[in-house]
Amino acid sequence: MTTILKHLPINQRVGIAFSGGLDTSAALLWMQKKGAIPYAYTANLGQPDEEDYDAIPRKAMEYGAEKARLIDCRKQLVAEGIAAIQCGAFHNTTAGVTYFNTTPLGRAVTGTMLVAAMKEDGVNIWGDGSTYKGNDIERFYRYGLLTNAELKIYKPWLDTDFIDELGGRHEMSEFMIQSGFDYKMSTEKAYSTDSNMLGATHEAKDLEFLNSSVKIVNPIMGVKFWDENVVVKAEEVSVRFERGYPVALNGVVFDDSVELMMEANRIGGRHGLGMSDQIENRIIEAKSRGIYEAPGMALLHIAYERLLTGIHNEDTIEQYHANGRVLGRLLYQGRWFDPQALMLRDSAQRWVASEITGEVTLELRRGNDYSILNTVSENLTYQPERLTMEKGDSVFSPDDRIGQLTMRNLDITDTRKKLFSYATTGLLSASAEVGLPQVDNNNLTARGLQDKSK
């Protein structure tokens, strides 16, 4: 049985994720006029560019909603954001600058909490504003059906009747005016923006062209750090974690995780911390480009990973990064609550995050330019006296190191034999000029090798 409805279900309750913008306003009014019974659901995700959440449900009622609800998703959103930091669930990076998966995290929370609210109201048909070319249509599809097995999906933007009548923003605006609503289109920007309290995404339109840089973006969570006319003063900041959870900023303890994230955003935003420009692979494997803001997530991530490197051993850190990349991709694909993701999340939170206790002090400057000034933790395994170059008691002696190096002879001998085996088969060629294998004309050559075993 299909779960996607191609045409509007008449005389049935249809839930719509309602933002109050032109698209969802026109869609709600159109559905009501065509005979559906629209229910409007708005997620309060702490969007930095939203001024009056309470006005949004009132708008929905004016446009014909049978019922309109505002769902506070902020606490759950911050919880999922902190979980992502604990697990390093980020797979899109460019030259060490990270995209913190803030939109996928928002979709995971919105897709589950709004559908749960609809289910309470006996609404089993859901629509949202995602287009068929993007990631969100699949994310919402997965999270919606995970939350309500009886759910049917109706999207006006997949309905040819809706598209024929209201296929563009001009047509939607005219429809609203003709219906008695003095709805003026907002000024068109050179790109589109989607945000929640974890971060903002700027994409599409002019940003689809790679010769349009971050300089055309007006940040909504930070400053134009690239503009030398913008004054950005260096600032010293401390971040404290207890058992993997951020608890204090600049010595101020926060009992409310939402308030802590908001303050982290304010601190990082003053410097433009956490902005990145990424070319990424969408779920459908086509590449897209986005410019992202995430000042609070970046600040917490830097402090968390600093403690991580001082507390855990190399193999644990390697596994954390490897699993984090896999988990980040699952999150991006809308699989944050799938068993394979839960398994990776549980292992990272149970065995890695639980040991992350301590405080990191940083100096923030412009953009992603910062220095770590101090790291303090009762769990640090970093102990400088073990490797001090000064005289004094040491945990091991020169004779101990000689013995350790002697043991390396076993694998060095095996490796040398392998290299000569490769030379015998023609994979490597030998020369007396250079003593190391190197690439030459697309072939790896071993020069100057002498088989000491013969």
Curated annotation (Swiss-Prot):
<dbReference type="Pfam" id="PF00764">
    <property type="entry name" value="Arginosuc_synth"/>
</dbReference>
<dbReference type="InterPro" id="IPR001518">
    <property type="entry name" value="Arginosuc_synth"/>
</dbReference>
<feature type="binding site">
    <location>
        <position position="194"/>
    </location>
    <ligand>
        <name>ATP</name>
    </ligand>
</feature>
<feature type="binding site">
    <location>
        <position position="135"/>
    </location>
    <ligand>
        <name>L-aspartate</name>
    </ligand>
</feature>
<dbReference type="InterPro" id="IPR018223">
    <property type="entry name" value="Arginosuc_synth_CS"/>
</dbReference>
<protein>
    <recommendedName>
        <fullName>Argininosuccinate synthase</fullName>
        <ecNumber>6.3.4.5</ecNumber>
    </recommendedName>
</protein>
<dbReference type="Pfam" id="PF20979">
    <property type="entry name" value="Arginosuc_syn_C"/>
</dbReference>
<comment type="subunit">
    <text>Homotetramer.</text>
</comment>
<feature type="binding site">
    <location>
        <position position="136"/>
    </location>
    <ligand>
        <name>ATP</name>
    </ligand>
</feature>
<keyword id="KW-0055">Arginine biosynthesis</keyword>
<feature type="binding site">
    <location>
        <position position="139"/>
    </location>
    <ligand>
        <name>L-citrulline</name>
    </ligand>
</feature>
<keyword id="KW-0436">Ligase</keyword>
<feature type="binding site">
    <location>
        <position position="280"/>
    </location>
    <ligand>
        <name>L-citrulline</name>
    </ligand>
</feature>
<dbReference type="GO" id="GO:0004055">
    <property type="term" value="F:argininosuccinate synthase activity"/>
</dbReference>
<dbReference type="GO" id="GO:0005737">
    <property type="term" value="C:cytoplasm"/>
</dbReference>
<dbReference type="InterPro" id="IPR024074">
    <property type="entry name" value="AS_cat/multimer_dom_body"/>
</dbReference>
<comment type="similarity">
    <text>Belongs to the argininosuccinate synthase family. Type 2 subfamily.</text>
</comment>
<dbReference type="InterPro" id="IPR048267">
    <property type="entry name" value="Arginosuc_syn_N"/>
</dbReference>
<dbReference type="InterPro" id="IPR048268">
    <property type="entry name" value="Arginosuc_syn_C"/>
</dbReference>
<dbReference type="GO" id="GO:0005524">
    <property type="term" value="F:ATP binding"/>
</dbReference>
<comment type="pathway">
    <text>Amino-acid biosynthesis; L-arginine biosynthesis; L-arginine from L-ornithine and carbamoyl phosphate: step 2/3.</text>
</comment>
<dbReference type="InterPro" id="IPR023434">
    <property type="entry name" value="Arginosuc_synth_type_1_subfam"/>
</dbReference>
<feature type="binding site">
    <location>
        <position position="201"/>
    </location>
    <ligand>
        <name>L-citrulline</name>
    </ligand>
</feature>
<dbReference type="InterPro" id="IPR024073">
    <property type="entry name" value="AS_multimer_C_tail"/>
</dbReference>
<dbReference type="InterPro" id="IPR023437">
    <property type="entry name" value="Arg_succ_synth_type2_subfam"/>
</dbReference>
<dbReference type="GO" id="GO:0000053">
    <property type="term" value="P:argininosuccinate metabolic process"/>
</dbReference>
<dbReference type="GO" id="GO:0042803">
    <property type="term" value="F:protein homodimerization activity"/>
</dbReference>
<feature type="binding site">
    <location>
        <position position="192"/>
    </location>
    <ligand>
        <name>L-citrulline</name>
    </ligand>
</feature>
<feature type="binding site">
    <location>
        <position position="203"/>
    </location>
    <ligand>
        <name>L-citrulline</name>
    </ligand>
</feature>
<feature type="binding site">
    <location>
        <position position="135"/>
    </location>
    <ligand>
        <name>L-citrulline</name>
    </ligand>
</feature>
<keyword id="KW-0963">Cytoplasm</keyword>
<keyword id="KW-0547">Nucleotide-binding</keyword>
<feature type="binding site">
    <location>
        <position position="43"/>
    </location>
    <ligand>
        <name>ATP</name>
    </ligand>
</feature>
<feature type="binding site">
    <location>
        <begin position="17"/>
        <end position="25"/>
    </location>
    <ligand>
        <name>ATP</name>
    </ligand>
</feature>
<keyword id="KW-0028">Amino-acid biosynthesis</keyword>
<feature type="binding site">
    <location>
        <position position="99"/>
    </location>
    <ligand>
        <name>L-citrulline</name>
    </ligand>
</feature>
<dbReference type="GO" id="GO:0006526">
    <property type="term" value="P:L-arginine biosynthetic process"/>
</dbReference>
<feature type="binding site">
    <location>
        <position position="131"/>
    </location>
    <ligand>
        <name>L-aspartate</name>
    </ligand>
</feature>
<feature type="binding site">
    <location>
        <position position="129"/>
    </location>
    <ligand>
        <name>ATP</name>
    </ligand>
</feature>
<dbReference type="InterPro" id="IPR014729">
    <property type="entry name" value="Rossmann-like_a/b/a_fold"/>
</dbReference>
<feature type="binding site">
    <location>
        <position position="136"/>
    </location>
    <ligand>
        <name>L-aspartate</name>
    </ligand>
</feature>
<dbReference type="GO" id="GO:0000050">
    <property type="term" value="P:urea cycle"/>
</dbReference>
